[in-house]
Amino acid sequence: SDVCSSDLLIVDAAQTAGSQPIDVQALGIDVLCFTGHKALLGPQGTGGLYVRPGLSIQPLVVGGSGVHSFDEQHPAQMPTALEAGTLNVPGLAGLCAGVEWILAQGVETLCAKETALAALFYKNIRDLPNVKIYGDPEMALHAPIISLNIGDEDSARIADILWEDYSICVRAESS
């Protein structure tokens, strides 16, 4: 944070929130954005924004807050100031349940398990013919995500095989 002390440090934690410990104070993070439907185990349509105390940001969209619907002025207090429209209460309840489960297990425990599983997967595929792995093989240096291609095979077909034959759930993307 000393390098850019006059600038804001905004971090996209879509892939890491819930699966990696994140100390916003130690890292000097001013704003942390995250989605709820990935490692936080919440439903789609949920997510959040951490804003460092004392930092003032303006909402992109205002109006229709479910909390102060009849007020002429949009609320200025955080986090209500950034809420436009009706709150997704069922979604937030699902996100809360996911976060509670993660905290009960321990983020560090889950992170270690996911890292070990990714390392085991990497170890078992790295020498297979036609496998192209992208990124650093050292799992401790990044989130436990492995990006790969197998020759010219369709990634959706590979994803189906991994799920049906090995119970490995992956996300297939086409290039």
Feature map (PLM): residue ranges:
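Short, small-residue-biased leader/transition segments that mark boundaries at the very start
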Residues: D2-S5
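Buried hydrophobic positions in well-ordered alpha/beta secondary-structure cores of metabolic enzymes
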Residues: D12-A13, L32, L49, L95, ...
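Conserved PLP-binding catalytic core of the aspartate aminotransferase-like
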Residues: T115, A119, L128-S174
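Short acidic loop-to-helix transition motifs that present clustered carboxylates
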Residues: Q15-G18, S175
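Conserved PLP-dependent catalytic core of the aminotransferase class-I/II
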Residues: P90-G91, L95-D136
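Structural detector of well-ordered beta-strand residues that form the stable sheet scaffold
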Residues: I10-D12, C33, Q58, Y134, ...
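Active-site PLP attachment segment
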Residues: L27-D71
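A short glycine-threonine-serine/GTX helix/turn-capping micro-motif
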Residues: A76-V89, G106
